[in-house]
């Protein structure tokens, strides 16, 4: 192995890592793009209603919409204090 081959192989490994990271970012952006525009507002309103009865943070509620062929499921995960 020559001196130049050592540095060249490192660039290939770096390129593959960068490509993998970019694929993850693109997949995340695509999944966010499919969510409806009203989802952040819905999450805020749910937080306000629950906040009337229990003190929770915005980070304690997660709203997600899963779509299948002909069905959409709204999933709420709320971490309530003990």
Swiss-Prot record:
Cross-referenced InterPro entries: MinE, MinE_sf
Disulfide bridge positions per record: none
Keywords linked to the UniProt accession: Cell cycle, Cell division
Residues spanning the membrane: none
Record bears the keyword Cell division: yes
GO biological process terms, semicolon-separated: cell division; regulation of division septum assembly
Family statement: Belongs to the MinE family.
NCBIfam families: minE, PRK00296.1, PRK13989.1
Role played: Prevents the cell division inhibition by proteins MinC and MinD at internal division sites while permitting inhibition at polar sites. This ensures cell division at the proper site by restricting the formation of a division septum at the midpoint of the long axis of the cell.
Name of the protein in question: Cell division topological specificity factor
Organism taxonomic ancestry: Bacteria, Pseudomonadati, Pseudomonadota, Gammaproteobacteria, Oceanospirillales
